[in-house]
Amino acid sequence: MSDWLYRFFCDVVSPLLFTKDGKHLSPPQIFGKNGSKPATFWIQPPEPVVSLTSHQFDPTILYRPRVFLWLPHFLVKDLMCPNCKKQILEKNGACPPRRIVDIEDSFYVVTWTYYCRKGCQSHFRGWTPSLLDSLPPYLRLAFPAVLSRRSGLSHRVLTQLRVGNQHKMGPSGVRSLLFELHTHRFNVLQAQYVEAVFEVVRGRQEMVDSSQQSLHAYISSSVPPFGDFSDVDKYAGFVPSENYLTQMMNKAIEHDEHDANQHTSCLAPDQLAIDDSHKVSHLLLSD
């Protein structure tokens, strides 16, 4: 994790996770329990135009990702252990954020670790499949991603994989599409940043001698470069490999196998098997 991203989680995300009402943790303000703002699970990045209009030339503001706060213990009366199903899970600290690849960028999921202290003494993370399956369906369906061992894909990317596979565009084509969309978003942010800097340059150019030759003389030395798409210390753009997309698509299909089989069994049969028992007597006579 780059330094700017680490500071972002420390300064912005961490205070929301550890909001207290007296001695006890309370739901984050973005959950909208007080009714002052619309409730949401998402921490949205600032609008680039707002910071650029005020000439805040800090690329890390434009790099900021979306963050999904998954805190199910605030959304159910009792968070029960999915193993023993008898004891209430206790909070056991926040998990490291997990990066999820979406259609045109990546976002992060942040959750808690839970511990069944009085029961089976098992540990669970908020995105553990068994814990997700134990939640009410309406709450479980709000989780936005399917996770792998270290990363994950959003449901929107998986839907794109399914639809692409149905229309003869496999994981290779979907990866090319994701790369195009991710780099396009980066290019738009970069263009906004550069155009805002040039606006300052043009404004200063009118105030200096027309004999000035170098553009760099108009730009403050404190304006940092925007960086490259794949620079891990800056924007850190990322698109998964074709093999990873294939594995995740197969994982999603296997997860839905039971429902697919149940759906197939409910369909009206178009053709029934033909009874070939009359051939048995013919075979016996031939022997």
Feature annotation, model-predicted:
Residues 202-287:
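RNase H-like nuclease fold core
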Residues 77, 112-113, 268-272:
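Core residues of folded domains in eukaryotic genome-function proteins
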Residues 78-84, 116-119:
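Short cysteine-rich clusters marking metal-coordination/redox-active sites
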Residues 73-74, 107-110, 118, 264-266, ...:
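Intrinsically disordered, low-complexity regulatory regions enriched in Ser/Pro/Gly/Thr
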Residues 89-222:
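DNA- and nucleic-acid-binding/regulatory domain cores of transcription factors and nucleic-acid enzymes
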Residues 59-65, 92-107, 251-256:
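Short linear interaction motifs
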Residues 52-58, 86-91, 153, 269:
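Helix-boundary capping/turn motifs
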Residues 1-80:
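N-terminal alpha-helical interaction blocks
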